[in-house]
Amino acid sequence: MAIKTYYDDDADLSIIQGRKVAVIGYGSQGHAHAKCLRDSGVEVRIGLREGSKSAEKAKEAGFEVLSNAEAAEWADLIMILAPDTSQIAIFEKEIEPHLKDGDAIFFAHGLNIHFKKIVAPKGVTVAMVAPKGPGHLVRRQFTEGKGVPSLIAVENDPTGEGTALALSYAAAIGAGRAGVIETTFREETETDLFGEQAVLCGGLEKLMMTGFEVLVEAGYAPEMAFFEVCHEMKLIVDLIFEGGLSNMNYSISETAEFGGYVSGPKIIDDHVKESMKKVLSEIQDGTFVDAMFKDVDAGQPGLKGLREEYANHPLEKAGKDMRSMMSWIANPLDETA
């Protein structure tokens, strides 16, 4: 099925310019959305919880900072950019009491709407604008006269103008310069979760850890194992990012290329594909999301335990030791502490 893509010429910027927009959250996406919207002539205020460390940054950027409830009462379009696990409480306690017919609530990820953890009043437009890039990239591209491709979707459309409103918002943050792709909350949510769990985070992380274990158990030095199964991953991913799998295979040695072709299917075989299908099924039927929120309600013992377990894997120690030799790496974690 062909996707439907929009550009600036398809958008009416005056629609979003006629709205009062509250951006809930001032993190990676929040600061980018707020600044780009303001530069596009939109009236914007920031909603934050009391005591938020982001409040000072938002004020320094020239925004009026309100509580989430005050922002929701003031606005007629509310973009919720708080973490998935925080959105439900924010919505129920601080946003929903102030919603009225004709208002709109927007999201950058569809999880809580798709799985009905958040249910908006029938008279409220529910839509999504999801840039396919981090906030700093969204902002930088915007200031350079470019844009980051974004997804839009509409879940509830009481006025019949939801798509036009979402497209106008997307254009105001620069997405129309690159392309705005129409999707659904279901498609965005389920594919996003699957990609994270089966490939980008869960799958890749375990692949590297298991490869490391195989080499070390076979008697190879942990440092060598780290280099071969983890450190060089960036080189490969950059090649794929720049030009696809074919570009990667063209750029590596013929030995690596041939080895990849003949051994890759031995690792990622039909059993792995069936396991991936099971992961997808548990996303689709809500099993994963229910388990995540059950853990959240209990104080996240599952997440915290797994986080500690993974952080203590021998691959992490080998990586820390080797990165200390690489002066060119700007490490986001303070590994000298």
Curated annotation (Swiss-Prot):
| Residue intervals passing through the bilayer | none
UniProt domain KARI N-terminal Rossmann: residue ranges = 3-183
Q: Which residues bind Mg(2+) 1?
A: D192, E196
> Which pathway features in its UniProt record?
Amino-acid biosynthesis; L-isoleucine biosynthesis; L-isoleucine from 2-oxobutanoate: step 2/4; Amino-acid biosynthesis; L-valine biosynthesis; L-valine from pyruvate: step 2/4
Q: Which cysteines are joined by disulfide bonds?
A: none
Which residues participate in Mg(2+) 2 binding?
D192, E228, E232
Instruction: Give the InterPro entries listed for this entry.
Output: 6-PGluconate_DH-like_C_sf, KARI, KARI_C, KARI_N, KARI_prok, NAD(P)-bd_dom_sf
Q: Which GO terms describe its cellular component?
A: cytosol
Q: Which residues bind NADP(+)?
A: Y26, G27, S28, Q29, R49, S52, S54, D84, T85, S86, Q87, G135
Keyword Nucleotide-binding carried by entry: no
Binding of substrate, residues: S253
Co-factor requirement: Mg(2+)
KARI C-terminal knotted domain spans which residues? 184-329
Known EC number:
1.1.1.86
> What reaction gets catalysed by this protein?
(2R)-2,3-dihydroxy-3-methylbutanoate + NADP(+) = (2S)-2-acetolactate + NADPH + H(+); (2R,3R)-2,3-dihydroxy-3-methylpentanoate + NADP(+) = (S)-2-ethyl-2-hydroxy-3-oxobutanoate + NADPH + H(+)
Instruction: Locate the active site.
Output: H109
- Specify whether Amino-acid biosynthesis is a keyword of the entry: yes
Q: Which PANTHER family match?
A: KETOL-ACID REDUCTOISOMERASE, MITOCHONDRIAL
NCBIfam families (alphabetical): ilvC, PRK05479.1, PRK13403.1
Q: Which HAMAP family match?
A: IlvC (MF_00435)
Q: What name has this protein been given in UniProt?
A: Ketol-acid reductoisomerase (NADP(+))
Q: Which organism is it from?
A: Corynebacterium kroppenstedtii (strain DSM 44385 / JCM 11950 / CIP 105744 / CCUG 35717)
Gene name of this polypeptide? ilvC
